[in-house]
Curated annotation (Swiss-Prot):
InterPro entries: Ribosome_maturation_RimP, RimP_C, RimP_N, RimP_N_sf. It is found in: Cytoplasm. Its main location: cytoplasm. This is Ribosome maturation factor RimP. GO terms for cellular component: cytosol. It comes from Helicobacter pylori (strain J99 / ATCC 700824). The gene is rimP.
Amino acid sequence: MTKKIEEKIEGVIESLGYLLYDVSLVKENEQHVLRVSLKNPNGAVSLDICQQVSEIISPLLDVCDFIQDAYILEVSSMGLERTLKTPKHFKLSLGEKVEVKLINKESFQAVLKDANDLSADFELDNHAIKSVEYKDLKKVKTLFEW
């Protein structure tokens, strides 16, 4: 269902100058919550941007009726520290510092340098590039350094 929602709202969000990072539908305290997270290629995602996007996509979602039950729509920034789950997440996070945990228990911190549909390239502290297929990743999380 979230894939259909993503397909429906992605073009609208891009027409406003922002990028759709993720869509998730969760249940919290018996209430369905549709979370839409954004990236602003020109800077931060402000509260005004979230409100603008919410006001535009909310009626669109109501007309499409993808979610049968009542739900709360939350529009937010993708966040400074987040888990990268899809090739799209990796592509939208290029140049960021990440913590990588592999299935074989190896872990390291690096800068995400490149990503495609099968793998990601990480620049290690010694400037070497380590290429890892997504299937070998256990968890990758962006790191915010103060």
